Amino acid sequence: MQPMLKYCGNRSLEDVQAAATSKADYLGFVFAKSKRQVTVNEVTRWLDQVNVNGKKLVALFVNEPIDQIVNVVKQGPFDVIQCHGTENRDYIMTLKERIDLPVWKAIHHSGQGLQMMRALEGVVEAFVVDAKVEGQWGGTGQSFDWHVVPLYLQEGKRQQVPVFIAGGINPHNVELLLPYGPCGIDISSGIEENGQKSSAKICQIEKKVLGDDSHISR
């Protein structure tokens, strides 16, 4: 079974245009403080100009006050909320009382990764396992030891939720990840050239992941 694709960190009209014509299942927008941070006004303006061909839209936050998440989601056509910080079970349960959307939780790979997944059993609709980089929450271009991917996938299967793998995935190394059979692949910097989403790199990723070099939306 082919993994789902999520292209995260879209931060310009040109990024959205490149991702919209791709075969991605999800497009991500970062509302946390980072070099890829966007505003909801920017995102809605871009989406007014681009047909994303049915792709689902993910709003990413890091330890954001719940009121602020509610405010953003009310203004934009988002399908998923991704919590990418240290949000715990109580936080996510409170968030879900306020917003009727699926919530994904990032797990930053460490010796406690599986324990963190188990602590969130039953309250999230997917996990995103990312590299842990001191002082940063994601989009670093750093990967983690993929030999442990099967352990995360096994825990996701036990909980009956998909597990996306993120962190440092690019056209040059994605083939090393594929044998582990991830449910989804989450890419940000790996499809960028000079800070912008690259249609050429997107094509390279999709040819390797989906086995098809025709660059059309699936």
From Swiss-Prot:
One of its GO terms (molecular function) is phosphoribosylanthranilate isomerase activity. It catalyses: N-(5-phospho-beta-D-ribosyl)anthranilate = 1-(2-carboxyphenylamino)-1-deoxy-D-ribulose 5-phosphate. Pfam families: PRAI (PF00697). Pathway: Amino-acid biosynthesis; L-tryptophan biosynthesis; L-tryptophan from chorismate: step 3/5. One of its GO terms (biological process) is L-tryptophan biosynthetic process. It comes from the Bacteria. Belongs to the TrpF family. This is N-(5'-phosphoribosyl)anthranilate isomerase. It comes from Halalkalibacterium halodurans (strain ATCC BAA-125 / DSM 18197 / FERM 7344 / JCM 9153 / C-125) (Bacillus halodurans). The lineage of its organism: Bacteria, Bacillati, Bacillota, Bacilli, Bacillales.
